[in-house]
Regions:
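Active-site-proximal alpha-helix that buttresses catalytic centers in soluble enzyme cores
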Residues: 2-88
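Conserved histidine-centered catalytic loops in small-molecule metabolism enzymes
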Residues: 4, 57-97, 120-125, 211-231
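Active-site metal-binding loops of divalent metal-dependent hydrolases
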Residues: 17, 179-180, 228-229
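Alpha-helical packing segments of well-folded alpha/beta enzyme cores
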Residues: 42-46, 73-76, 142, 146-157
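Short glycine-rich phosphate-binding loop at a beta-alpha junction
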Residues: 58-69, 164-176
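Phosphate-handling substructures
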Residues: 82-152
Length: 231
């Protein structure tokens, strides 16, 4: 069923399901990995409860879906919308490089502990531990580069939703991507720098919700909780 605030456009962020590297805690950027069996079940469970006619994500209310080109994100999209008329070749779906995972450079496939140990051995981070939010990745992306591309995507989304802030017509957007890039996306949606100490959790296969306060495009907001109409 749709929620009580459905007249204001929303942005649903969907993290891909579990992969082998998700299980192991390895930094995964450009490496192409498929979902594990459990990862498939995670997304199928989310889809059965939250995606469909009259549900939280109602395909009839979705005007645009941005999907990371990585295989695990495309697989997640297919599972989320398998019972709808939306497919990857739909006009409403775009494979979007702007929402790909943070380019981890030389840290690709490493554990956080391995990254920190390597940097310490090479005389880096003398004043504290490495943080991807502030320091970025060697031979990969800096926080500034990630910020720039996410801001471009957010601008596209707001251009789509701006004419429909009072529910003139449905204008929900879905973004299917990765744990790190989506948490960065939330921070930038709210106007925060990536290194702001805002702890965010987004489980594999989970859905998060962003919108606007008081139907105002200038007041982007994060749904901490949502009320639902009676059955």
């Amino acid at each position: 069923m749709a929620d009580l605030d459905a007249s204001t456009p929303r942005v649903f962020i969907a993290r891909h399901g579990e992969t082998e590297w998700t299980k192991n805690g390895r930094y995964t950027g450009s490496t192409e990995l498929e979902l594990t069996a459990d990862g498939v079940k995670q997304v199928e469970g989310t889809a059965s409860h939250l995606v469909g006619s009259g549900k939280l994500i109602d395909p009839a209310r979705v005007v645009q879906i941005f999907v990371s080109p990585r295989k695990r994100a495309q697989q997640t999209f297919n599972l989320l919308f398998k019972d709808s008329d939306i497919s990857l070749d739909s006009d409403r779906v775009k494979l979007e490089e702007e929402i790909t995972e943070w380019d981890h450079g030389m840290y690709e496939g490493w554990l956080g502990s391995e990254i920190r140990a390597s940097r310490k051995e090479r005389g880096l981070d003398k004043d504290g531990d490495w943080s991807i939010w502030a320091d970025g990745c060697e031979d990969g992306e800096s926080p500034e580069q990630v910020t720039e591309r996410l801001d471009r995507l957010i601008a596209k989304i707001r251009d789509i939703q701006r004419p429909h802030m009072n529910g003139e017509k449905p204008a929900d957007v879905v973004v299917v991507a990765h744990g790190m890039s989506l948490r960065c996306f939330v921070k930038r949606w709210l106007g925060y720098p990536l290194d702001m100490p805002l702890a965010l959790m987004l489980s594999p296969g989970a859905i998060g919700i962003l919108s606007y306060l008081k139907h105002d495009i200038k007041q982007p907001a994060f749904f901490v909780g949502m009320s639902l109409p009676p059955l």
